[in-house]
């Protein structure tokens, strides 16, 4: 009874909620109906609190609809039950931005020696605090969840990483984060590693760039120590690999990682990967690997929106014991939009100039300190440049941007260009409308809202937006 009732609720919730929300928060819940009490089990406290806060009314409404007067009491608990709703009975969302696959069945874990053989050991890394189990984790202690600035652009990724750190190997495995350079993916990897190590001091957590995995494998082959290499990587509790796209065209490395990936998953050992693009779009990587990358949860890390950029600047300034005026933070954030590293670099330059000259940090001072950087941004990002870039991206004529044509093949790129003009320039809505064939400002506003909606609903539109932002901001 519990499976059929909760299955009905799941099917309706999947229809009502955005695919990202359903996969992230609702799908992991398990249900048990006993003594007229429906207990929903969440994988951790974070998910439980979120579901109860955001979706309790939806669930109660559906129970009332399906059960009539015989409504069960609803309870929430952290944990799991043995029998779960088969994932095959849930309607698969069409091209979701976040995908969730069934977790692998647990297997008997083979314990290895705590440290690899002396004939081979991992390549050195700049940051190498030794874990208590003897593994060089390479996790940077400076990066944690407390100093990661949350915004709409990274909210899902941050939530997923928190869940994984609460319950490694069980929450979402593998977790795949993708997005452009300098958006915080590496920070999140280190934050997960630190959180796991804080909770379980003896946990064997390894962070690395994908190229280091390749270097370690080559070294192991040269020293005839491939078995030690395998033991090391297959006996960790969490493997965090950055920039997995660098495995492209490295067939032997892909072969070894394929088997390592399978071994870790079978042992319920956590895997987190990052890339600069969606798994299926990584060229030069075997299809069987790309398929496995999407088995767990795939989350996009977007370029930060204005409010998040301002918050990042204020947080970084606070770390330097600098009071950054609000108007200065907004001035910088409105003009530098591509990624977090660019913002940090600009702020560091402003702070250094202020320290050297002893001057107060004002808008005029910032304009002078960043004059070359701001001039370059203003030169790169104009409405005309946006129109040309979007037209080329969607393979339409520049004249179509200004025309009255309403076919989707033209209207959608035009809406995208308007939304980008609002995000990337300082022009007002009427000015943007004038640049698009004399359109009214309400048309521009509608276009911006439409693109926001489509980015939530369509993976393709979200990818187009991110790709165009990167192109125009580089």
Curated annotation (Swiss-Prot):
Q: Which residues bind ATP?
A: 182, 184-186
Q: Where is this region: Domain III, AAA+ region?
A: 138-354
Q: Where does the UniProt annotation locate this protein?
A: Cytoplasm
Q: What GO cellular component entries does it have? A: cytoplasm; plasma membrane
Chain spans, region Domain IV, binds dsDNA: 355-474
Disordered: annotated span: 112-137
Record has Transcription as a keyword = no
Q: Residues annotated as region Domain II?
A: 91-137
Task: Give the record's keywords alphabetically.
Answer: ATP-binding, Cytoplasm, DNA replication, DNA-binding, Lipid-binding, Nucleotide-binding
The UniProt entry, under InterPro entries, shows: AAA+_ATPase, Chromosome_initiator_DnaA, Chromosome_initiator_DnaA-like, Chromosome_initiator_DnaA_CS, DnaA_C, DnaA_dom, DnaA_N_dom, DnaA_N_sf
Q: What processes in GO biological process is this protein linked to?
A: DNA replication initiation; regulation of DNA replication
Task performed by this protein: Plays an essential role in the initiation and regulation of chromosomal replication. ATP-DnaA binds to the origin of replication (oriC) to initiate formation of the DNA replication initiation complex once per cell cycle. Binds the DnaA box (a 9 base pair repeat at the origin) and separates the double-stranded (ds)DNA. Forms a right-handed helical filament on oriC DNA; dsDNA binds to the exterior of the filament while single-stranded (ss)DNA is stabiized in the filament's interior.
Task: State whether it acts alone or in a complex, and with which partners, per the record.
Answer: Oligomerizes as a right-handed, spiral filament on DNA at oriC.
**UniProt-recorded name of the protein:** Chromosomal replication initiator protein DnaA
Q: What organism does the record attribute this protein to?
A: Photobacterium profundum (strain SS9)
Q: Gene symbol?
A: dnaA
């Amino acid at each position: 009874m519990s499976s059929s009732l909760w299955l009905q609720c799941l099917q309706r919730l999947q229809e009502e909620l955005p695919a990202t929300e359903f996969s992230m928060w609702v799908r992991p819940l398990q249900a048990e109906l006993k003594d007229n009490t429906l207990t929903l089990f969440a994988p951790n406290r974070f998910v439980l609190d979120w579901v109860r806060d955001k979706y309790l009314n939806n669930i109660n409404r559906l129970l009332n609809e399906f059960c009539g007067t015989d409504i069960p009491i609803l309870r929430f608990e952290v944990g799991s039950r043995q029998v779960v709703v088969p994932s095959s009975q849930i309607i698969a969302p069409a091209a979701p931005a976040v995908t969730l696959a069934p977790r692998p069945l647990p297997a008997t874990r083979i314990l290895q020696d705590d440290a690899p053989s002396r004939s081979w050991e991992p390549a050195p890394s700049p940051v190498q605090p030794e874990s208590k189990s003897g593994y060089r984790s390479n996790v940077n202690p400076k990066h944690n969840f407390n100093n990661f600035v949350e915004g709409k652009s990274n909210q899902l990724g941050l939530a997923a990483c928190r869940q994984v750190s609460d319950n490694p190997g069980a929450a979402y495995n593998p977790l795949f984060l993708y997005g452009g350079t300098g958006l915080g993916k590496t920070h999140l990897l280190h934050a997960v590693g630190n959180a796991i190590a804080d909770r379980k001091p003896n946990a064997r957590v390894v962070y690395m760039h994908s190229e280091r995995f390749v270097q370690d494998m080559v070294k192991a082959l040269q020293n005839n120590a491939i078995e030690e290499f395998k033991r090391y990587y297959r006996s960790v509790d969490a493997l965090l690999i950055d920039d997995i796209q660098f495995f492209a065209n490295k067939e032997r490395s892909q072969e070894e990682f394929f088997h390592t990936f399978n071994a870790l998953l079978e042992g319920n050992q956590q895997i987190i990967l990052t890339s600069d693009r969606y798994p299926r779009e990584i060229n030069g990587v075997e299809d069987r690997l790309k398929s496995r990358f999407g088995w767990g949860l795939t989350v996009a890390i977007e370029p930060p929106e204005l409010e998040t950029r301002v918050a990042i600047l204020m947080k970084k300034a606070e770390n330097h014991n600098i009071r950054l005026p609000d108007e200065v933070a907004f001035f910088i954030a409105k003009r530098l939009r591509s990624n977090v590293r660019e913002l940090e670099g600009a702020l560091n330059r402003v702070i250094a100039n202020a320290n050297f000259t002893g001057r107060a940090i004002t808008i005029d001072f910032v304009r002078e300190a960043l004059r070359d950087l701001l001039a370059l941004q203003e030169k790169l990002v104009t409405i005309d440049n946006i129109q040309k870039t979007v037209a080329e991206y969607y393979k339409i004529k520049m004249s179509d941007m200004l025309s009255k044509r309403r076919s989707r093949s033209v209207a959608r790129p035009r809406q995208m260009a308007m939304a980008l003009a609002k995000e990337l320039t300082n022009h007002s809505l009427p000015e943007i409308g004038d640049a698009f064939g004399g359109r009214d400002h309400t048309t521009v506003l509608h276009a911006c809202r439409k693109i926001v909606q489509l980015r939530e609903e369509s993976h393709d539109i979200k990818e187009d937006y991110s790709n165009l932002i990167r192109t125009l901001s580089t």
